[in-house]
UniProtKB/Swiss-Prot annotation:
Belongs to the actin family. It comes from Mus musculus (Mouse). It comes from the Eukaryota. The gene is Actl10. SUPFAM superfamilies: Actin-like ATPase domain. This is Actin-like protein 10.
Length: 346
């Protein structure tokens, strides 16, 4: 099961302030065009841009009429509750959808493998999360976030490229080129300190930038993803993602800890780096031993399509017969207003 369309949560804003999908005819209009990013670190920061992006995704991309289709929206496990109220307003008042449902990305990641209890460890473009889920409900007080994610790594990788190849004038590389190169050449080290100290262990290779230039990279390949495990490399005070995953397990009741540790689901495009699963497993097991939980053996689930696991889980959930009574309808919204989302959705 794969999505028909995958695009970044950004839009081009022409001079008359109407977002257009990247690649759409409006992108070619000359003058006064800027890229807007409606979502930052998993939180909506530009509702106008998001409305335009969704409208064009539905009408121009999927070629459907919003007023004819119910919509399931995923949101960040740490997103503020008022964000859901605003989503309801946007869907019912601006896009006039007949019904909607909202679920956090952690639950949908678990649903993608048919599970409703476990620990979701997400590493996407804007934010990372470790979220315990039990019986379909998220444990908000045991949810941890890290603002180092794929976009941060891409910016860091650009800096590494510029430093490694000062003669090639790489400052002007597009974000798309840097991101594509990051996905092709970077990997997670299983022994970062050892690899840094021993140049003989660097897996050196040449890569084409697409403009005819070639770069030869060594330590840059494994230094790029490392801030997910050591955020301090970029000046962030938070612990790395494996530590946050362990802290999430610590926060839940002892009676449920083993059960949730048996299903640690990895999701998001930033978990696709070669070596990511192995490093996460090593560090999570080490955390358990270090803090007196030697019997706790986390079992990681890493499906090949985990970069779109949230979409897969949402598609599976919305297709269930038992789910159809869980939609928030237009009539319900008109009677109770946007505050109803706090009662209807977890």
């Amino acid at each position: 099961m794969k999505p028909r369309i995958v695009l970044k949560s950004s839009s081009l804003m022409p001079s008359w302030d109407r977002p257009v999908l990247p690649g759409a005819p409006g992108c070619e209009l000359a003058g006064g065009v800027a890229r807007a990013h409606p979502i930052k670190h998993g939180v909506v920061v530009d509702w106008d841009a998001l409305e335009g992006l969704w409208e064009r995704l539905m009408v121009g991309g999927l070629q459907v009429h919003p007023e004819q289709w119910p919509v399931l929206v995923s949101d960040s496990p740490s997103a503020p509750p008022k964000g859901r109220e605003k989503v309801a307003e946007l869907l019912f008042e601006a896009l006039t959808v007949p019904a909607c449902h909202m679920a956090n990305t952690a639950l949908l990641a678990l649903c993608s493998i048919g599970a409703f209890s476990g620990l979701a460890v997400e590493a996407g473009a804007g934010v990372c999360h470790a979220t315990p889920i039990y019986a379909g409900h998220s444990w908000h007080k045991a949810t941890f976030r890290l603002n180092v994610a794929g976009s941060t790594l891409s910016r860091y990788f650009r800096d590494l490229l510029v430093a490694a190849c000062p003669d090639l004038q790489l400052q002007g590389l597009s974000r798309k080129t840097v991101t594509q190169l990051k996905k092709r050449c970077c990997y997670v080290s299983l022994d970062f300190q050892g690899d840094i100290c021993d140049p003989a262990r660097h897996q050196r290779a040449c890569f084409c930038l697409g403009n005819g230039c070639y770069v030869r990279l060594g330590s840059e390949r494994f230094r790029c993803p490392e801030p997910i495990f050591q955020p301090s490399l970029l000046g962030h005070p938070e612990p790395g993602l494996p530590t946050l995953a362990f802290q999430a397990l610590q926060k839940i009741p002892t009676t449920l800890r083993t059960r949730l540790a048996n299903t640690v689901v990895l999701a998001g495009g930033s978990t696709l780096f070669p070596g990511f699963v192995e490093r996460m497993n090593l560090e999570l097991e080490a955390q358990c031993r270090r803090h007196g939980y030697p019997a706790l053996q986390p079992c990681l689930v890493a499906h090949p399509g985990r970069d779109t696991a949230v979409w897969t889980g949402g598609s599976m959930m919305a297709s269930l017969n038992s789910f159809q009574c869980r939609w928030m309808t237009r009539a319900m919204y008109q009677e109770h207003g946007p505050l109803l989302v706090r009662d209807v959705f977890d």
